[in-house]
Amino acid sequence: MGLFSKFNAVAGALVLAATTAGATELKLADFQPPTHFVVDKVYKPFQDAVSSGTGGAVTVRLYMGGELGPGPVEQYNRAVDGVADFAISLPGYTASNFPLTLTAELPGVINTETGTEDIWSHIDLFADEYRRVQLVSLWSSAPNVLYTRDVAVRSPADVQGLNIRVPSRNAGLQVEAWGGNPVSMPVTEIYNAMQTGVIDGAMIDTTATRAFRLGEVAKHLTLGFDATNSPFFIVMNRDAFGGLSDKNQAAVLEAGREASTLANQTQLRVAEGGVAAFEEMGGEVIRLTGEEAAAFNALSAPIVDKVVAEVGGNAADIVKALRGE
């Protein structure tokens, strides 16, 4: 190797070392286990997109399973307080902060297939709720269905008196309308609560069959009613975001937007497999007929107007926009 070639090789190595040493590593906190499908299907592509979009100047490190602090309910505050640079959570866990966002989860408001794109088409309507953080990703999920341990649910009468875990207040209103008792509980606690009989069932999408092993503790799965739909988000600490260059901020936001679509598509695909998996594990899948579903939907229908009236502001505009009215 000639002197000039050696010089180029050394110079290149020094530039690479300087770039790596100067990289900003951002922490992403998730309460879900490291075995969750979201790691390979969503987070790793997000990590790659951030690194690629910033030329390696910004990297993302995952902290799964509550490694930066236990409890899904505290996820939003971890981003606000800077414990994590990014945090994934559900707006329903801190519902008082996100009344407008949560209109998207009301029964029959979101189209399962187009919900995430519909949300982003009208994202300005939600922007005021994210003043304390930087919104990076927001997506709709698969419909929430009803897992039950012992009672096969085919009519609202079957729900009477049952203790049903719900992901949010709005989902709780639906359970109440059917005659059940809503129980607020993080997803990580459902398995033990159902196994021990603390709850009789749970409202959650069918990714939970495998992701949270509900196929092991529930015997019945009821679907076909107008369902609530739990939004997910990734939010970022404002100071961490502000500390990035304009170019790198744009790269993070672009990666987050891509992650929204990817997360939604992945959840829908895994949820579809979750129904089949439930049957394979010996569970009963109850697919309501049109007449059976109508009995549930008639009781749920007034919830939308009730919540819109309580929230006020532009809640009615959001519901109309998401419904395509």
Question: How should these model regions be labeled?
Answer:
Residues 12, 24-110, 128-325:
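N-terminal secretory/targeting leader peptides
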